[in-house]
Design a protein with these regions (language model features):
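P-loop (Walker A) phosphate-binding loop of NTP-binding proteins
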Residues: 11
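Conserved substrate/cofactor phosphate-moiety recognition/catalytic segment
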Residues: 21-96, 112-116
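ATP-binding Walker
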Residues: 14
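NTP-dependent small-molecule kinase module
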Residues: 164-223
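A glycine- and Lys/Arg-enriched "phosphate-lid" helix/loop adjacent to the NTP-binding pocket
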Residues: 113-190
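Hydrophobic anchor at the beta1->P-loop junction of P-loop NTPases
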Residues: 8
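Walker A/P-loop
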Residues: 17
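Loop/turn-to-beta-strand initiation segments
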Residues: 97-101, 146-148
Length: 223
């Protein structure tokens, strides 16, 4: 079976991580990958460590994850920028090109959240994140041409309702979130724009507003 390079993007509470776990289990069943088949209940196997404060890949890093994700917010914006850039660049390395590679948000989220919440990356500034995303995609197309980009989205009123009710299979994933309800439309529109402008040609959207997780998984598989 061909390798699968996959990036999910979208606002918080759109269902990226929930669907990501189901996709990983499905992929494991197709490839016989025991690491995916036997995922612990709290894990999704995607690299989901690119949005502050959740900057530690959960599998194999439990011993320092809590402290690291608490201390990361003590860094000044310049150091945060350096750290995030290291994470993005690391996952462009050749070591990830040969096997399945699953990511959530990757460098895309910084284009949305860094100017809004982190204190760096605004358009026209040093390390402007929107421009960085454009250049990063050029490298992805060169080194990982089979990458699939998926926008996971929901209507703003659905996002706000899930947020207010804390509706998530991964409540710990949303603890300490910097995402604000008042920013729902702005963030949703920004991810949509990133998706629409993306140079990645293998891309599609999944709207989870009215769909069950199983229905969203079926839609993913069908595409």
């Amino acid at each position: 079976m061909d390798k699968l390079h996959l990036t999910f993007i979208g606002t918080e509470y759109s269902g990226k991580r929930t669907l990501g776990r189901r996709v990983a289990l499905w992929r494991g069943s197709k490839t016989g990958n025991d690491d995916l088949i036997n995922l612990p209940p709290e894990a999704c196997a995607f690299h989901d460590h690119f949005v502050l404060p959740w900057v530690v890949h959960e599998l194999g890093h439990e011993y320092h994850r809590g402290l690291s994700e608490k201390k990361i917010l003590d860094l000044n914006p310049d150091l945060l920028e350096h750290f995030q850039r290291y994470q993005f660049e690391y996952h462009m390395g050749s070591g990830f090109a040969g096997d399945d590679h699953f990511l959530i948000d990757w460098f895309y989220a910084d284009a949305v959240y860094a100017p809004l919440y982190y204190g760096y990356g605004a358009p026209g500034s040093y390390a402007a994140r929107w421009e960085y995303a454009e250049h990063a995609e050029e490298r992805v197309l060169q080194d990982m041409p089979q990458m699939i980009l998926v926008l996971i989205k929901s209507r703003p009123e659905v996002i706000r309702d899930r947020l207010s009710r804390g509706e998530s299979e991964f409540p710990q994933r949303h603890a300490g979130s910097l995402f604000k309800e008042k920013d729902t439309e702005f963030v949703s529109d920004a991810f949509q724009k990133l998706f629409d402008q993306s140079k990645i040609t293998r891309k599609f959207e999944i709207d989870t507003s009215d769909a069950s997780v199983d229905e969203s998984l079926d839609e993913f598989i069908s595409k």
